[in-house]
Amino acid sequence: MKRVMFHAKIHRATVTQADLHYVGSVTVDQDLLDAAGILPFEQVDIYDITNGARLTTYALPGERGSGVIGINGAAAHLVKPGDLVILVAYGVFDEEEARNLKPTVVLVDERNRILEVRKG
């Protein structure tokens, strides 16, 4: 059996921009993507801590060291600059992979600088 499991998370990031007229996605500082192990164009869920909104989109790489978390397209109606969010990526794993999975959690400060990277 295959299982859908969370494998990476960027926790309590602050949204820095929103562009309603961009063609979808979330732009994320490449340093954060690398730390979490999230690839460009990988599907991610966004959980808005501030207002409870939840949505699915894909990650686009942003400028390294910029701290950018940019909500693009229609999602800009739901998630606003200044909101705290959690970005989560899931993968499909077989039983053994799922049981041995050690998800990556990236904790950031209010400027989206990496504070800590946790495995498992």
From Swiss-Prot:
It is an enzyme of class 4 (lyase). GO terms for biological process: alanine biosynthetic process; pantothenate biosynthetic process. Keywords: Autocatalytic cleavage, Cytoplasm, Decarboxylase, Lyase, Pantothenate biosynthesis, Pyruvate, Schiff base, Zymogen. The gene is panD. Catalyzes the pyruvoyl-dependent decarboxylation of aspartate to produce beta-alanine. Heterooctamer of four alpha and four beta subunits. One of its GO terms (cellular component) is cytosol. This is Aspartate 1-decarboxylase. The keyword Flavoprotein does not apply. Its main location: cytoplasm. It comes from the Bacteria. CDD domains: Asp_decarbox. Substrate binds at residues 57, 73-75. Its cofactor is pyruvate. Is synthesized initially as an inactive proenzyme, which is activated by self-cleavage at a specific serine bond to produce a beta-subunit with a hydroxyl group at its C-terminus and an alpha-subunit with a pyruvoyl group at its N-terminus. InterPro entries: Asp_de-COase-like_dom_sf, Asp_decarbox. Its EC number is 4.1.1.11. The keyword Transit peptide does not apply. Belongs to the PanD family. It comes from Thermus thermophilus (strain ATCC 27634 / DSM 579 / HB8). SUPFAM superfamilies: ADC-like. Binds 1 pyruvoyl group covalently per subunit. Pathway: Cofactor biosynthesis; (R)-pantothenate biosynthesis; beta-alanine from L-aspartate: step 1/1. The active site is at residues 25, 58. It catalyses: L-aspartate + H(+) = beta-alanine + CO2. It is found in: Cytoplasm. The modification Pyruvic acid (Ser) is found at residue 25.
